[in-house]
Regions:
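Non-transmembrane functional regions of envelope-associated proteins
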Residues: 2-197
Length: 197
């Protein structure tokens, strides 16, 4: 019996040495992050190979483009923003996301805008939380405060982790803050409002 085992080991000695050695090298390379650029390139390629997704007609995105900026100037005046949000609110959407920095009054009409913020429970405002660092990514930026008239439960963080190659491949659902609190992401806040409606 011992002779068979020795013969088996001798016959397969190359595989018995090579397999664990290659496994250890690959594990080591993964641990130090040497394979990450290749993995990210493959992930990007897989996304390019996917078939295009259909657009959901129930979701409408209203953007501010260059023509709007030329016509109305930037930043958009509070009175104009209040008019726009009121028109959107009249359509009775399940959720409204305002992905604009609105931490201080702009132009005229702040009282209108603040009143609209307080009377629209399905409106989510944006905030950006600065200098969050974890083992996988770093977000270094300055704070963008949320609109002061919005209640805390109607505010979502717009932080996005940037990979080492400068691309954004992930979104966050929530952020752990240094004081132990959790900040829900802007997109999750809107999704929860939409699904609750």
């Amino acid at each position: 019996m011992a002779g068979h085992f020795k013969n088996f080991l001798w016959k397969w000695r190359g595989v018995a040495i090579t397999t664990p050695a290659i496994s250890l090298v690959v594990i080591g390379l993964r641990l130090i992050g040497a394979l990450e650029p290749v993995e990210l390139a493959m992930l990007d390629q897989f996304f390019r190979w996917r078939s295009p997704e259909t657009t959901d007609s129930r979701i409408v995105i209203i953007g501010i483009d260059e023509a709007d900026v030329r016509q109305y100037a930037w930043p958009i005046d509070d009175a104009l923003l209040a008019q726009l949000l009121d028109k959107v609110r009249q359509q009775k959407p399940r959720a409204i996301g305002l992905d604009l920095a609105r931490d201080k009054p702009v132009g005229t009409g702040y009282s209108q805008l603040a009143s609209l913020f307080k009377s629209t429970p399905n409106l989510v405002g944006a905030t950006k939380i600065a200098d969050l660092v974890s083992s996988n990514f770093a977000i270094t930026s300055s704070n963008i405060e949320p609109p002061p008239a919005l209640p805390a439960e109607q505010i979502g963080a717009i932080n996005l982790p940037v990979d080492a190659d400068g691309r954004i491949r992930r979104g966050l659902m929530a952020l752990g803050l240094p004081d132990g609190k959790i900040a829900t992401s802007f997109s999750l806040q809107i999704a929860l409002l939409y699904l609750d409606g």
